[in-house]
Amino acid sequence: MQGNLSAWLVKHGIVHRSLGFDYQGIETLQIKPEDWHSIAVILYVYGYNYLRSQCAYDVAPGGLLASVYHLTRIEYSLDQPEEVCIKVFAPRKNPRIPSIFWVWKSADFQERESYDMLGISYDNHPRLKRILMPESWIGWPLRKDYIAPNFYEIQDAH
C-alpha cells in the first residue's frame, strides 16, 4: 500500500521504496544512502520542517545497519501534523550516510549518538565524534556482534 508522500515521490520521479505503515498509520520509506541528502532537502522544501527524532539500529548480526528518521510536517492550517518515517540502510563494513545536519540542525547530537553506539559515519557532519563513550573506547557497543570487554579491566582504579 502506498501513502500520500510515496505517491508524490513517484509522481516526481524520486527513487525510494515504500515499506508500508507502522501501527500508528505513519508511512515508512526506504531511501538509498547516496540519495538521502537530496531527498532530505526535497522533503524539507515539501514541508517536513521538523526532525522529531533520529536513531539507528543493527538489523542483524553481520547484516546492515539502519539509520531511522521521524519527520513531521507542521503547518498552521493543519489540525493533524503529517508524519513520515525514513529508513536508510548502510553496509556494516563501511557504514556511511550523508548527514542531514545542514537540513535539520536537531540532527546534531542524534547523529553523533548513532555514530558513537553503532559506528555509522555521517558524511559532512560538522562535529562527528563520540558523545557518550570515552574517545579511547574501541568498538561500537550497540552492534549485535559487539563483544563487551570485562568492565573491571576498562575502568580506572580510584
Curated annotation (Swiss-Prot):
Localisation per UniProt entry: Plastid, Chloroplast thylakoid membrane
Pfam families: Complex1_30kDa
Membrane topology: Peripheral membrane protein
Chemical reaction(s) catalysed: a plastoquinone + NADH + (n+1) H(+)(in) = a plastoquinol + NAD(+) + n H(+)(out); a plastoquinone + NADPH + (n+1) H(+)(in) = a plastoquinol + NADP(+) + n H(+)(out)
InterPro entries: NADH_DH_suC, NADH_quin_OxRdtase_su_C/D-like, NADH_UbQ_OxRdtase_30kDa_su, NADH_UbQ_OxRdtase_CS
Record's keyword annotation contains Transport: yes
SUPFAM superfamilies in alphabetical order: Nqo5-like
GO cellular component: chloroplast thylakoid membrane
Keywords (A to Z) from UniProt: Chloroplast, Membrane, NAD, NADP, Plastid, Plastoquinone, Quinone, Thylakoid, Translocase, Transport
Similarity comment: family membership: Belongs to the complex I 30 kDa subunit family.
HAMAP family membership: NDH1_NuoC (MF_01357)
Protein name: NAD(P)H-quinone oxidoreductase subunit J, chloroplastic
